[in-house]
């Protein structure tokens, strides 16, 4: 009898897990859970073990070629490159077939996204300008964590109009493009000509694979791995290799198959349920030891939090509203400016993407206090934006 009861409970638990992973908000919930676990570990008696685990040296060697990095760097440079493969594929799909495929469809979210990148950077600069050592952090509040934002929106999925979801997705994709440009232009250092030549050869190989509509995903994975390693050694940030790989995968194969859709389907689950939660676990572990109330007035914390809480909604909503009033763009049918403002507030959830940019802006040499304050600013700004965004979205969509 006990044996049958155990089997019944096991089946019930499996069904609950399966039901959870089918939820639209599952990725966002898992992200939040990973971040909370990281913070609990960082502020518990296990904090040393947590940090030792993240700083565990991991080496890869093939002949004379070797990559030696700590586990957290493998997560940030390697796993996040895989995430950016997915970003590259999503951007390509939307540009050629989706919400960004025509001028009329693309211009409204494009203008909104520009505002959502420029104004947060300006807010950050205005608050942090007195300390030159903080100058590199201007890009941190520019980012939007699309997984979290869509997860919050999914909690209200039954009452959120479809055009509003499409607007958020298009906005986030253009936001990702902006982040890619920022990484390429401002966070690539000490370039190696030899590694760049290897990278160029790998890119040419990917272009040829695309040109001949090769559908075998393993071919892109092999060449992509070579590209990633070359880009990593070149001094350009390795996540850019992911974007190039994503763009190289063809939308359609020779026989009408859709390699990009197939690969996107595979990677989306890995991204939502493994890569991003792992990144959150590795980067959200902020220790509160030694932190006092006075730190809340720190220019770095205030600059990041204000950029996310104030800069994002002001930039997105302001640029959207002005573009429509000047006749540069048209408000999509089925949504209103109150809902646009709610989405703009929601886009202040920078979380994993902001933490990623912070890891590029402030390396280990910046000091523990700078890294801690930057992560605290991101957590504060993202939490406030998530709560306010949810409340505004609930109110504005209920009225519609």
From Swiss-Prot:
One of its GO terms (biological process) is regulation of pH. Gene3D superfamilies: Na+/H+ antiporter like domain (1.20.1530.10). One of its GO terms (cellular component) is plasma membrane. The keyword Cell membrane applies. The keyword Ribonucleoprotein does not apply. It catalyses: Na(+)(in) + 2 H(+)(out) = Na(+)(out) + 2 H(+)(in). The chain crosses the membrane at residues 26-46, 71-91, 107-127, 137-157, 166-186, 189-209, 212-232, 233-253, 273-293, 299-319, 340-360, 373-393. Keywords: Antiport, Cell inner membrane, Cell membrane, Ion transport, Membrane, Sodium, Sodium transport, Transmembrane, Transmembrane helix, Transport. It is a multi-pass membrane protein. It is found in: Cell inner membrane. GO terms for molecular function: sodium:proton antiporter activity. HAMAP family: NhaA. This is Na(+)/H(+) antiporter NhaA. The gene is nhaA.
């Amino acid at each position: 009898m006990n044996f049958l009861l155990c089997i019944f409970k096991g089946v019930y638990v499996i069904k609950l897990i399966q039901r959870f992973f089918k939820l639209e908000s599952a990725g966002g919930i898992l992200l939040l859970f990973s971040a909370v676990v990281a913070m609990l570990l960082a502020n518990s008696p296990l904090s040393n073990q947590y940090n030792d685990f993240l700083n565990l040296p991991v080496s890869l060697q093939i002949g004379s070629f070797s990559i030696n990095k700590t586990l957290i760097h493998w997560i940030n440079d390697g796993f996040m490159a895989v995430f950016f493969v997915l970003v590259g594929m999503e951007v390509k799909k939307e540009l050629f077939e989706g919400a960004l495929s025509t001028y009329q469809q693309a211009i409204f979210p494009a203008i909104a996204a520009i505002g959502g990148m420029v104004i947060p950077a300006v807010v950050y600069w205005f608050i942090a300008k007195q300390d030159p050592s903080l100058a590199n952090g201007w890009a941190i509040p520019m980012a939007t964590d699309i997984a979290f934002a869509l997860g919050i929106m999914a909690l209200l999925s039954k009452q959120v109009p479809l055009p509003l979801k499409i607007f958020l997705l298009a906005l986030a994709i253009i936001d990702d493009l902006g982040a890619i440009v920022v990484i390429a232009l401002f966070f690539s250092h000490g370039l190696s000509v030899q590694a760049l030549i290897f990278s160029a050869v790998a890119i040419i190989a990917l272009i040829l694979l695309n040109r001949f509509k090769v559908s075998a995903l393993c071919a892109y994975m092999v060449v992509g791995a070579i590209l990633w390693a070359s880009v990593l050694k070149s001094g350009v940030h390795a996540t850019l290799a992911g974007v190039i790989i994503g763009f190289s995968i063809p939308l359609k194969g020779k026989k009408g198959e859709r390699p990009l859709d197939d690969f996107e389907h595979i990677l989306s689950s890995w991204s939502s349920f493994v890569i991003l939660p792992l990144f959150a676990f590795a980067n959200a572990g902020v220790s509160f030891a030694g932190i006092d109330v006075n730190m809340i007035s720190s220019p770095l914390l205030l600059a990041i939090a204000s950029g996310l809480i104030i800069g994002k909604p002001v930039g997105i909503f302001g640029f959207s509203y002005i573009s429509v009033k000047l006749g540069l763009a048209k408000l999509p049918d089925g949504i209103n400016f109150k809902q646009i403002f709610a989405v703009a507030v929601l886009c202040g959830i920078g979380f994993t993407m902001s933490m990623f940019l912070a890891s590029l802006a402030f390396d280990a040499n910046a000091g523990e206090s700078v890294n801690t304050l930057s992560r605290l600013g991101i957590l504060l700004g993202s939490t406030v934006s998530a709560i306010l965004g949810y409340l505004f979205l609930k109110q504005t969509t209920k009225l519609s």
